[in-house]
Structures are given as C-alpha cells and as structure tokens.
Amino acid sequence: MHIALGYRWFPTAAGYHIERALQALGHTVTYIGLPCSQRAGYDTTVPVDEIVAALPEKPDLYLWIDPAGRYFPPGIERLPIPTACYLIDVHLGRWREQAARFFDVVFIAQKDYLERFQQAVGHDQVYWLPLAAAPDVHRDHHLPRIYDVGFVGNIALAHRKTARARRLRLIAERFRTNDFYRVYTPEEVGRVYSQSRIVFNCSIAGDVTMRVFEGTACGALVLTDTVANGLDELFEIGREIVVYQDDRDLLEKIAYYLAHEEEREAIARAGQARTLREHTYIHRMERLIYLVSSSHLLAPMRTVPAAERWRARREVYIHLHMLDALIDQARDMGLNPFQRARAILPSLLRRLIL
C-alpha cells in the first residue's frame, strides 16, 4: 500500500515511529507534512488534494497524525482516496472532535473518549488504537541499571506546578536518577530506560502515555499513576506494571521495589514480554491498515454544506493557530490557570475580531 503521511516530523514523536513501522511492514510512505531541517514538506496553506494529485504515484491512503504542529491542510474532504487520522492528545483539546469529522476512519489513543468521538463523527468507524513502543529503539541494551528511577519527558512540564513536576522533585531528592531536564534522542531514551531499575510515569490528564510502553519494552519496571483509558486491559496491574495512588504511595513503592530485586525484575520481565507481544507500532499499524481496508463509510465533511464545513475548519484553525499557541505561551510563563485565562482571552478576542 502507498500511504501519504501528514504529521510534524520529530524523532521522538509517535508519527516518526509509525512511519518506520509502516515501512517495516512493506508499505510505501510519502511524507507530506510540515517542512523541517531534516526533510522537505508543505506549508499549511497548500491544499492536500493538490499535493496528492501532484505525486508521481497515487496513494492508497492519506493518514494524518496528531499532534501535527498546527498542520491541518485544506482539502482533506476532497481527497479521492480513503482518509484516516490518529488522534493522540484527545485528552487535551476538544477541537479534535471537529478535526475527526474530516476523515473517513478515526483512531484515538485513549479509550475513554471513544463514545464522545463516535458521537462527534456520527458513525462507528472510530477505533481505540493505544500508543506503543518501537522495539528497534525502545529495547533493553543490557546495560548496568545505574539509576533507581528513570524518566524522559517534556522539559517544560518540569517547570510547571503540576503533579508530575512535584513528583519528579520528590524522586530526585531521594533516589538516584537520570537528568530529568535533558533532551534525549530516541536512541538515548532506550539507553536511559535500559539503565533504570524503575521507570516513573505520571500522566498529564489520565492518559496512557508512550512512556508506559517504552519503559516496559526496555525491561524496566514501570510505575505509573492509576488511570483508566484501558490501562488494565493493556497490562495486568501488579504483575506486568505497578500503579501508585498518590505521592506517599509512589515513594513507598519505589523504595519497596528497589529493596525487592527479584520481585521487581519478575514484573519488569512480564511487562516487557507483554509489550513485545502485543504493544509495538507494528501491531498498531497492522490493525490500522486492516480496519481502514475494511471501512465503508465516508467522512461527514465530504457531504455537508460548505458553510458547515467552513465552521468546523474555523474551529480547528482557531485552536491550532491561535488558542493552543497562546496557551503554550502562558504555560511557559509559569502562570496558574486563572492567570492563563486572563492573559489569553484579550489576545484571542483581538485576533478573532481583527
């Protein structure tokens, strides 16, 4: 299959691993996302149907992957080929419900949002497709496990007044860790987790993150906060991964599993086996291709009146190019939620009016 892939290229993003998995499965992938220093691409204003029409070989599928760095090109609903999207951060913004209506088949990373997106899209071609690990990158390097606790994540989050930031500080004060504030390459992520006895995870909004799969794939015990979104279907809690309830429980369980090496390693081995058996990007893309190939319904935006299509695209545009950018700026300034609202609203209103 020839797949036209739209996302923002970045070597630690899910899109990067998805592209490699599709290629490993024998598919031809043409990148038509945003340009960057590593590869050519297209501006957000270029209609995607024109891009696809100009390709030397007609694709069999257009796949758009969130987050795409504010890349949501016009013309998706005019594409003469099946379209699909993989919405990852569904827990962070409801604009994705409007974006989903532009695609024939919709995949979301968090199970608890299935019903909401099925209602928004208006048909049942909306599927749960959890995140995963890339075993060529996220693997056990068989290095000495010199860190009690390992964590690789968003640097900006470490500076915010969040549960994740607070817990990272508590861990760093008590245990030997890697440098939480450093930016790591994909290969370095695998090495850090291979050097960690325990991989710490704290979700942003109750989501099952990439870190759960990456840490287990590298042979570490993953200790994550208690969340829904199908976590207990993906792993057997207590046998393949461990969960904590609060700060105190987190610290106590870290100390316990550091002191009980055989028990820790048994859970780590079981978690690793489960991930490699069921939770790689190869597994996810096999399911995605199967479901797309068996789909029969069309995206709502292919047939709705132009005015409705314009309103939906406008909502997506406002969030991608205005609201999300303003929220990011406010967060980077260290503002609390009330301060963010006061800072964002005047600027947003000015942009909408002008």
Stretches with model-predicted labels:
Residues 210, 245, 279:
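Residue-level signal for the nucleotide or nucleotide-sugar donor/cofactor binding architecture
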Residues 77-85:
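Short beta-strand/loop segments at the ligand-binding rim of alpha/beta enzyme cores
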Residues 250:
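Catalytic phosphate/metal-binding cores of nucleic-acid and nucleotide-processing enzymes, i.e., regions
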Residues 1-51, 56-75, 88-237, 323, ...:
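Nucleotide-sugar donor-binding catalytic core of glycosyltransferases
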Residues 190-191, 253, 257:
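Small beta-barrel nucleic-acid-binding modules, principally OB-folds
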Residues 259-354:
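C-terminal amphipathic helix plus adjacent low-complexity
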Residues 241-247, 257-261:
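Conserved acidic donor-binding segment of nucleotide-sugar-dependent glycosyltransferases
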